[in-house]
């Protein structure tokens, strides 16, 4: 107890000294000095940047799968059924809204959503955001930091990378952001995230670059994310990740959130990728990707040892498609791609993501390791006959997968499946080969599309999975 009293007395004494006239004069001098040199602050940079970050509100409708009722109950839920009349507890159930008799496999449901965006061209009103922010939108409203509101329309969308470009109608007095060279980023660089989390309005958080080239997250088909610990939450999608110069280094896209909240692991699409994709959208209204025409995997120490490759990182080529850009350049199965245009390639996913932003006709150079020798090949990207398509362009009920022709009329290969997508929910997996649909053989994407053009209420896919043949049913 005495020790406590003494400690408090000492504190009181020091406070008394601090309040003496002599100390007050010293404090005023110190305060003046601090004011003169100014405390470090992000405010001056943010004053220039925040007018280029916008809030986006959308309205639209989407197709949702409705449950299919057992056949012996369907007679009770027709249009004239007492179960579906006004006042019935079943009136608004899916079974009375087209699902009771099997419906058409889906039902239109209206939605409202919000997100963020970044102005990249003030004169033309171009705003970049995430595809998932404006997907299926019929109405898009953009609000600036000064409160002004504008209508906007979609210029182009790319579900594979989750980038979309919208255009503000009748733009006036806008401020565009400057894009940085995201290839120059280093782990440890400071980052600032700006967006509209939870619809609160413009919000700023800060952090650092935690990692670069993140892939394998099953968030998008082309993944080459910047990882940051700057807080990113729902509504931040499409917002800006900037450096301390106020330059755009990425578009905030996703978070790792096991419990739905921020835990300091957020992901942004690099600005160089954004620049390449949006320039194609401006020119073509879509992304026209060039392709190498190879299949491969990540190179790890075990694979390197088994294949007697003197490298630890790179993209291992397991197959080269006939008549592809890679085949014409002389790339062979067993090669390891170590660089693209002179810059190191760490993985197959990184190679795929970088090539995936390049348009048809792009000329590139690849550094290879072949039987222990380093060689360089030059090639021009072309539109491959093995070109992948988004499954939603074939049939809305299997949205969330990428597919390509297997070749030699042997079916359609599922090359990737997004987690929790409709495609994943019906059981499709990466590597599946669709060889039939609704009791009709499927040799290629064109045949699958033709079968599904009739929009069947029930879809039965015959899948070859490894050595097994299975059926997946969607209704």
Swiss-Prot record:
Signal sequence, renumbered to the chain: 1-26
Instruction: Quote one Gene Ontology molecular function term.
Output: identical protein binding
Localization per Swiss-Prot or TrEMBL: Cell inner membrane
What is one GO biological process annotated to this record? protein quality control for misfolded or incompletely synthesized proteins
Q: Which UniProt keywords apply?
A: Cell inner membrane, Cell membrane, Disulfide bond, Hydrolase, Membrane, Protease, Repeat, Serine protease, Signal, Stress response
Q: What domain of life is recorded for the organism? A: Bacteria
Known InterPro entries for this protein?
Answer: PDZ, PDZ_sf, Pept_S1C_Do, Peptidase_S1_PA, Peptidase_S1C
According to its UniProt entry, what is the function of this protein? Answer: DegP acts as a chaperone at low temperatures but switches to a peptidase (heat shock protein) at higher temperatures. It degrades transiently denatured and unfolded proteins which accumulate in the periplasm following heat shock or other stress conditions. DegP is efficient with Val-Xaa and Ile-Xaa peptide bonds, suggesting a preference for beta-branched side chain amino acids. Only unfolded proteins devoid of disulfide bonds appear capable of being cleaved, thereby preventing non-specific proteolysis of folded proteins.
Q: How does it assemble?
A: DegP can reversibly switch between different oligomeric forms that represent inactive (6-mer) and active (12- and 24-mer) protease states. Substrate binding triggers the conversion of the resting DegP trimer and hexamer into catalytically active 12- and 24-mers. The conversion of 6-mer (DegP6) into 12-mer (DegP12) or 24-mer (DegP24) is crucial in regulating protease activity.
Q: What is this protein called?
A: Periplasmic serine endoprotease DegP
């Amino acid at each position: 107890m005495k020790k406590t009293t003494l400690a408090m007395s000492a504190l009181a004494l020091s406070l008394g000294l601090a309040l003496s006239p002599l100390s007050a004069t010293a404090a005023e001098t110190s305060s003046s000095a601090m004011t003169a040199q100014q405390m470090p602050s992000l405010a001056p940079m943010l004053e220039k940047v925040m007018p280029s970050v916008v809030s986006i509100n959308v309205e639209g409708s989407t197709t949702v799968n409705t449950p299919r009722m057992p056949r012996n109950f369907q007679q009770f839920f027709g249009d004239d059924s007492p179960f579906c009349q006004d006042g019935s507890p079943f009136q608004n159930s899916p079974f009375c809204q087209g699902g009771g008799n099997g419906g058409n496999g889906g039902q239109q449901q209206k939605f409202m959503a919000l997100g963020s965006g970044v102005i990249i061209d003030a004169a033309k009103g171009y705003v970049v955001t995430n595809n998932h922010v404006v997907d299926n939108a019929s109405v898009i409203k953009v609000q600036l930091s000064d409160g002004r509101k504008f209508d906007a329309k979609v210029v182009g969308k790319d579900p594979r990378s989750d980038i979309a470009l919208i255009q503000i109608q009748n733009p006036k007095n806008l401020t565009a952001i400057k894009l940085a060279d995201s290839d120059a980023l280093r782990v440890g660089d400071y980052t600032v995230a700006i967006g509209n989390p939870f619809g609160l309005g413009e919000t700023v958080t800060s952090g650092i670059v935690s990692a670069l080239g993140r892939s394998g997250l099953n968030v998008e088909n082309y993944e080459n994310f910047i990882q940051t610990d700057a807080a990113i939450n729902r509504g931040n999608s499409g917002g800006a990740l900037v450096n301390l110069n106020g330059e755009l280094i990425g578009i905030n896209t996703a978070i790792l959130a096991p419990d739905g909240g921020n835990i300091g692991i957020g992901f942004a699409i690099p600005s160089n990728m954004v620049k390449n994709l949006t320039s194609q959208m401006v020119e073509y209204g879509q992304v026209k990707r060039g392709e190498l025409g190879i299949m491969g995997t990540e190179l790890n120490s075990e694979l390197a040892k088994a294949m007697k490759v003197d490298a630890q990182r790179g993209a291992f080529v397991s197959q080269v498609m006939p008549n592809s850009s890679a085949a014409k350049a002389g790339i062979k199965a067993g090669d390891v791609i170590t660089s693209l245009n002179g810059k190191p390639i760490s993985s197959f996913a990184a190679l795929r993501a970088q090539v995936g932003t390049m348009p048809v006709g792009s000329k590139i150079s690849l550094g290879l390791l072949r039987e222990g020798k380093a060689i360089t090949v030059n090639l021009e990207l072309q539109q491959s006959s093995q070109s992948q398509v988004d499954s939603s362009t074939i049939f809305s009920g299997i949205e969330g997968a990428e597919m390509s022709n297997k070749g030699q009329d042997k079916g359609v290969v599922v090359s990737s499946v997004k987690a929790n997508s409709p495609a994943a929910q019906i059981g499709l997996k990466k590597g599946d080969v669709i060889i039939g649909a609704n009791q009709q053989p499927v040799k290629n994407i064109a045949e699958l599309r033709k079968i599904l053009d009739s929009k069947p209420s029930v879809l039965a896919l015959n899948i070859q999975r490894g050595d097994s043949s299975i059926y997946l049913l969607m209704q």
